[in-house]
């Protein structure tokens, strides 16, 4: 058992009465998700000793971290990435989004299943499979997971030059990413694919975690609600940053609906250069507008893949302009 003087979280937790028994697995996560089991803080702390000072006993006699503390969440992510994905160096600016890794991993695994559904239920793997991550951020989460699990090659784009500088450091310090993740800056804040997608480039899929909110005020209000649920009554002067995330990561004009609608419109110009376009959709109420946009551009096939993590339900929408015959030709050329 881990120990550190003068008193450690494990010792404090072990003395608590009425210790609550938690299920061994988290409900709803994808079967291949490495994070289905509850966090093993012993193992994580061995992989990343920097996590130890952030461990604390809970009211139920368990061990956890304070999820309202951005430094604790950041260190937990660092430990998870090192322990499960072999990432030796990972750091993000203080004001960058620190995403929940189990949920991000679910998106990658369900996307792999989507590709497999067009390939005789065999997941296409290796560097020949190219994905475009819109809004890669400083954290590089999707490329890290996709490369480790399936050997995929990624291009990551972002409008934030500071985020890309941090991402470039992550790439340079991890050999597995050097030849599998290329970073590009989107210099037009109103464009999504235009300017970062060359005429001759082909992608097997795109993925995106779009800005959720329609304004900075809306983003701040959501963060205050999260803090309240976690029992944190104090509201910081800049509440948006408590959970991480710059303006471009958290909100944009039109919010999630506006961003994904623009993505749908831009995807028409790349119709024959991509098999599946996809985007996370956090709000179920966003779906009707996205379906309407997809009907307008005459997408050949549209799928909605639901995901769950405990009581939280999310989904991503996928669309393609390829006919069944074109899909078969794509698979034969690129995935065989």
Curated annotation (Swiss-Prot):
Q: Which domain of life is it from?
A: Bacteria
Q: What is its EC number?
A: 2.1.1.181
* S-S bonds: none
Q: What reaction does this enzyme carry out catalytically? A: adenosine(1618) in 23S rRNA + S-adenosyl-L-methionine = N(6)-methyladenosine(1618) in 23S rRNA + S-adenosyl-L-homocysteine + H(+)
What Gene Ontology terms describe what this protein does at the molecular function level?
A: 23S rRNA (adenine(1618)-N(6))-methyltransferase activity
UniProt main location, coarse: cytoplasm
Question: Which terms does the UniProt entry file under GO BP?
Answer: rRNA base methylation
Q: Which CDD domains match?
A: AdoMet_MTases (cd02440)
Q: What is any Pfam family matched here?
A: Methyltransf_10
Localization recorded for this chain is: Cytoplasm
Q: Does the record bear S-adenosyl-L-methionine in its keywords? A: yes
List the NCBIfam families hit by this protein, alphabetically. Answer: PRK11727.1 (NF008725)
| Family the UniProt entry places it in | Belongs to the methyltransferase superfamily. METTL16/RlmF family.
Return the HAMAP family for the record: 23SrRNA_methyltr_F
What is the role of this chain? Specifically methylates the adenine in position 1618 of 23S rRNA.
Protein's name according to its UniProt entry: Ribosomal RNA large subunit methyltransferase F
Which gene codes for it? rlmF
